[in-house]
């Protein structure tokens, strides 16, 4: 599985994660991505190790699971891509209020 360590795996198909993407047409691509989150601390640690990460670097995250985690899911929405799609803009930079380029990193 080449997914983020915090995504829960499908119990019936462990090679898959319980995740989704909302894809907009017209060449825009992914507008929303989400997943059910893994709550089992040992599964999360194993996933981190499988991805070559040091679990000690994620203690803050592991603590959030260790002390009161509940089953939950989450998602992220790309506002610029959503605006690009709704407004039928040709390029995403036209939807970004303060676009960054290699030559311009400050508004």
Spans of features found by a protein language model:
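A translation/RNA-centric and nucleic-acid-associated enzymatic feature enriched
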Residues: 1-107
């Amino acid at each position: 599985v080449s997914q983020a360590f915090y995504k829960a795996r499908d119990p019936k198909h462990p090679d898959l994660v319980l995740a989704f993407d909302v894809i907009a047409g017209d060449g825009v691509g992914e507008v929303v991505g989400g997943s059910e989150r893994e709550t089992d601390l040992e599964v999360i640690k194993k996933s981190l190790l499988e991805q070559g990460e040091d679990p000690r670097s994620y203690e803050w995250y592991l603590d959030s699971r260790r002390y009161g985690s509940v089953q939950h899911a989450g998602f992220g929405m790309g506002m610029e891509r959503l605006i690009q799609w709704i407004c039928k803009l040709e390029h995403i930079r036209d939807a970004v209020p303060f676009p960054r380029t290699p030559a311009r990193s400050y508004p």
